[in-house]
Swiss-Prot record:
Its main location: cytoplasm. Binds 1 Mg(2+) ion per subunit. It is an enzyme of class 2 (transferase). The gene is aroK. SUPFAM superfamilies: P-loop containing nucleoside triphosphate hydrolases. This is Shikimate kinase. It comes from Synechococcus sp. (strain CC9902).
């Protein structure tokens, strides 16, 4: 009997998997176990941005504004997309620049879709400073971002609706769904 992960890796042919979704959707916490199960490398794009910039994301926003941050984010995504066999946790706003989609679609794009109430709860419990939520009414700011981004996230190759599953369970769910996107090369050869 064939190992399903080995078969999936063969089908992926080194294509990277890009996790997209709102801040707090679990891209990093899901990406790590997903990469481990696939034997892929894991990259947190926000961490790479901080390394490249030499400061934190809130400091980049303060110094360069959102436009400056998005420019660095696009450069980092371009560099990451040159590599293969990665699971990449992207920043929540990566989808807002049309030019980023070319890099994202060099791999498989998976949207981690978490409902508003869960996002609010997760972000409330999260110690990470989120520059776009540093407003008098963070919930209204989140609503605006959701309204702008949900249609863009909908362009993903695969949507995974997350309720209260653990990151490990979400990773397992992605592994079960990925084969539905990718043809088995042995089936293609037989035709």
């Amino acid at each position: 009997m064939t190992d399903p992960i080995l078969s999936l890796k063969e089908r992926l042919s080194g294509r990277s998997i890009y996790l997209i979704g709102m801040m707090g959707s679990g891209k990093t916490s899901t990406g790590r176990p997903l990469a481990k199960r696939l034997g892929y490398g894991f990259v947190d794009a926000d961490a790479v941005i901080e390394q490249v910039a030499g400061c934190t994301i809130p400091e980049i926003f303060e110094r360069d504004g959102e436009a400056g941050f998005r420019s660095i984010e696009s450069q980092v995504l371009n560099a990451i997309s040159q590599r293969h066999s990665l699971v990449v946790a992207t920043g929540g706003g990566v989808v807002t620049k049309p030019e980023n989609w070319g890099q994202l679609h060099s791999g498989i794009v998976v949207w981690l879709d978490v409902n508003r109430a869960q996002l609010i709860e997760r972000l409330r419990d999260d110690s990470t400073q989120r520059p776009l939520l540093q407003q008098p009414n963070p919930e209204a700011a989140l609503d605006t971002l959701l309204q702008e981004r949900r249609p863009l996230y909908g362009e993903a190759d695969l949507t995974v609706v997350i309720k209260d599953e653990s990151p490990d369970a979400v990773a397992d769910g992605i592994l079960q769904l990925l084969p539905t996107l990718i043809k088995d090369p042995t089936e293609q050869r037989e035709r």
